[in-house]
Structure formats: C-alpha cells, structure tokens
C-alpha cells in the first residue's frame, strides 16, 4: 500500500480504541442527562450529542468532533414544574435511552475487537521473536 509504510497494526487498532472511547464518553453523557430539565422556566434542556469521526488514511490519526443533535425535544404537560413554560409544558432532552444503549453496545464491541487485534499482534510478535532465537 502506498503511503502506509511504517504504520503498524497496533497503531491502527490503538486509534480505533481512541475513537470508541470518544463515542462511549458522549453516549454515557447523553444517558446521564436523559431526564434532566432546563434550569429556567421554558428553557431548553440538555441536547443530545453525537460523536462524528472523519475517515482517514491508515497513516493518519482519526479526527473527530462532537455535534448537537437538532431533533426536537420531547415535551410533556407538567404545570407547576419549575422548568415548565407559561402553558405548563416541560421540555425534556431529545435523548432516547434505548438508542444510546444500542450505541454503547456497538461501541463496546468495536472497542473489544480493537483490543483483540492488539493482543493478537502482540502474540504474533512474541512468537516471531521466539522463532528468531532458535
């Protein structure tokens, strides 16, 4: 492969680990705030975040950013709630816990796969060194 000389499988898997860590961090924050409300009457509650990573070549570090999900907030009638608006409507975060849990499971699976790649490469390197000792 042109342009990928000197890039190890371990480095690629380690980059994959960092990507999944970022995804996990964002999704756990979303879950932690799934039932939060605004701090002011009629204000906006927590807005779901999404980790977005740009595809890069094998020899580059993945770049990512966190964007806000622009889907609408959930709303319920809660007259008298300190964060409800004048009509008694309370806005809730646009976080779906089931979606976040599914994303967490996928990210954990990808994280574990990258760990297995690193362990396999480490084992292969160890075996190669052992063979060279003979």
Locate predicted features:
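Amphipathic alpha-helical polymerization modules
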Residues: 1-134
